[in-house]
A protein has these predicted regions:
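Ligand-binding loop in jelly-roll beta-barrel domains
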Residues: 32, 89-115
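Short strand-coil-strand connectors
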Residues: 71-75, 98
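Short acidic-glycine-tyrosine-enriched beta hairpin
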Residues: 74-89
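A cytosolic small-molecule/anion-sensing beta-strand core signal
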Residues: 64-65, 80-81, 99
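Glycine- and acidic-residue-biased ligand/ion/polar-headgroup-sensing regions
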Residues: 56-58, 62-68
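A short, N-terminal "cap"/entry segment at the start of jelly-roll beta-barrel domains
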Residues: 1-36, 118-137
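Conserved short histidine dyad/triad with adjacent acidic residue
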Residues: 39-54
Length: 137
């Protein structure tokens, strides 16, 4: 079966920590698979993910529009449209928007645990615009 996901028909999640919004296209709830998690993210200027890592999961960002920095063990590097960022499992990382940012992300497999290294548990909390709460694991 082929799935077609339309962005305007999918639930939007807003981070409890201001400045981040995401829409999932592929996840357990939408496609009944846990092999990967995929969606788009919007960051306002200066919004950032916490410094974190994912156990048992590879993480990819493809920058569509805007500019950001990626922090990892290699230092802090600028990224922009057309750049693909690959974060191996268990590598600490942070993405910070230096201007409004739009990117596609996917994580595989979708059976992972996120560990916050700098930040709070609130960094993992997202509210659906319909009022339900989604907590990243």
């Amino acid at each position: 079966m082929a799935y077609i996901f339309r962005e305007d028909e999918l639930p939007s999640l807003v981070s409890v920590v201001p400045g981040r919004e995401r829409i999932f296209f592929v996840n357990q709830e939408l496609a009944n698979i846990d092999d990967l998690l995929a969606g788009v993210m919007h960051y306002k200027k200066d919004a950032a993910s916490p410094l974190h890592l994912h156990k048992n999961c590879e993480h990819f960002y493809f920058i569509i529009n805007g500019r950001a920095t990626v922090e990892s063990d290699d230092g802090i590097r600028p990224v922009g449209p057309g750049d693909m960022i690959f974060i191996p499992a268990e590598e600490k990382h942070r993405l910070r928007a230096t201007e409004p940012l739009f990117y596609f992300e996917f994580q595989a497999p979708n059976r992972f645990k996120t560990t916050i290294l700098e930040g709070t548990d609130a960094d993992l909390r997202w509210e659906r615009k319909d009022g339900r709460v989604w907590v990243q694991t």
